[in-house]
Design a protein with these regions (language model features):
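Membrane-interface amphipathic/juxtamembrane segments adjacent to transmembrane helices
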Residues: 28-69
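Alpha-helical transmembrane segments and their membrane-interface junctions
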Residues: 79, 84-103, 162-176, 229-248
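Membrane-interface interhelical loops and short amphipathic "cap" helices
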Residues: 1-11, 101-116, 166-178, 241-247, ...
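Hydrophobic alpha-helical membrane-embedded segments
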Residues: 15-44, 181-197
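Membrane-interfacial entry segments at the cytosolic side of transmembrane helices
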Residues: 144-151, 247-251, 272-287
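Long, highly hydrophobic alpha-helical transmembrane signal-anchor segments
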Residues: 1-24, 143-186
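Loop-to-transmembrane boundary segments
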Residues: 67-92, 198, 213-232
Length: 407
């Protein structure tokens, strides 16, 4: 019953998180596109900054933007904030349910630091808080300085945090921790900067005072940051399905490169929304950077002894070697990957992959190879301490099966 409750809770939270994220990202992208497409035509209302005409769903829309505020406040205002809050709350709930509750599987790597669960959770929470505090401090002191200095400072901050996490947590835990920090920065921008600034403007209008334009300038800065951080955060969200991305020694470098690629993609669309010529030149650095990711994802895999893969299965893997490989997999993986898992509160093997017999292992050797030889994804956090020489034996088995199938 506990297992059933956990499964459904996780599923519902994931679904809610995705729905809220779509709503938040959709509205964010829409308003960035709207803002960049505004035209300062003749006949605009007093204090209006620009307007846009749009057609959708069989109707026409006339939108007018006021840079600070209109002369008279309308009776009803629609606030775009709950989407962001719901995304963060559901995301943090997932973090707690999966990564904090199962820290020994998803966060702790005993080879790096043999942390207690509570220690891993505290480090994670402190990292989330300090990530926002340092970012906010950089933005506040850089508001009137060169924008490129600000961008470089934020990039260095995230890169350093990525490296630090990769040295402390498991590869999967470190990757998701960076995503949590970025997501928290984005939501905190809405909760603590953008919305309070807009409320101050509304309060000034109600009091018949002239709103301070600084609130709009700060909100625009933070909104632009959110715009450029969105794609990297989405990438990190879906990355745990691809161990070659998150479970290699240079995964922290991959995050840094993804930050640049995501920013270039958003820059392309931001310029396109202004109706200027799209900057197609961004395709070249994107292709180059993607190639670098492809290369270092292979470079950071476990280092194994090179084996000639021309021999037949029998020549390459003697019976005793096959038995040894099976013994390694059964002893290091089958506490979870079994028809009756021994791991607490685990009813079925992950993805229903059982690794108890020789037939089980041979049938799943490609997945085993990807998770434990091409990356450090399994065992999670290396909780059963799979050594390099043991990964090498698994690699030998994989090569034997591969060669036999391709004869």
């Amino acid at each position: 019953m506990i297992f059933l409750f956990q499964e459904w809770t996780e599923l519902i939270l994931r679904w809610f998180h995705v729905i809220a994220g779509i709503a938040w990202i959709g509205s964010s992208f829409y308003f960035i596109a709207l803002d960049l497409s505004l035209k300062q035509n003749k006949g605009l209302p007093d204090k209006a900054h620009g307007e846009a005409w749009q057609v959708h769903g069989g109707g026409f829309y006339h939108l007018v933007k006021y840079l600070v505020a209109p002369s008279k406040l309308p009776s009803e205002l629609t606030w775009f904030k709950w989407e962001a809050y719901a995304t963060w709350v559901s995301g943090f709930a997932l973090l707690a349910l999966i990564y904090y509750a199962g820290a020994e599987l998803y966060m702790i790597d005993i080879v790096k630091y043999d942390l207690e669960k509570y220690e891993a959770v505290i480090i994670s929470l402190l990292g989330i808080i300090f990530g926002w505090v340092i970012y906010d401090f950089i933005c506040r002191i850089s508001l009137k300085t060169n924008v490129y200095v600000l961008i470089c400072s934020i990039f260095i901050l995230i890169t350093v945090m990525s490296w630090v996490y990769s040295e402390i947590f498991s590869y999967r835990g470190a990757f998701m921790q960076v995503g949590t920090v970025l997501g928290t920065i984005m939501v905190a921008n809405v909760l603590m900067i953008i919305i309070p600034g807009q409320k101050k403007v509304v309060a000034s209008l109600i009091a018949n005072e002239t709103p301070d334009p600084i609130h709009g300038a700060i909100a625009k800065q933070r909104s632009l940051h959110n715009n450029y951080l969105t794609l990297p955060v989405i990438f990190i969200m879906i990355s745990n399905h691809y161990p070659l991305i998150y479970a290699t020694k240079y995964s922290w470098v991959i995050i840094s490169i993804i930050l640049i690629i995501g920013a270039l993609i958003r820059h392309f669309f931001n310029i396109k929304h202004t109706r200027a010529n799209p900057p197609y030149w961004v395709c070249f650095p994107i292709i180059i950077l993607a190639s670098v990711i492809f290369y270092i994802s292979d470079l950071g895999k476990p280092q194994l002894t090179k084996i000639k893969n021309t021999a037949s299965l029998i020549e390459l893997i003697p019976k005793e070697t096959l038995v040894s490989a099976k013994e390694i997999i059964v002893s290091k993986c089958s506490m979870c990957h079994a028809r009756e898992p021994m791991w607490e509160n685990m009813k079925n093997a992950p993805k229903l992959v059982n690794l108890e017999s020789s037939a089980d292992i041979i049938n799943n050797i490609q997945s085993i190879h990807k998770q434990s030889v091409l990356s450090y994804a399994m065992p999670p956090g290396n909780i059963s301490f799979l050594e390099e020489n043991e990964r090498n034996l698994i690699n030998q088995l994989y090569l034997s099966v591969h060669n036999l199938k391709n004869k």
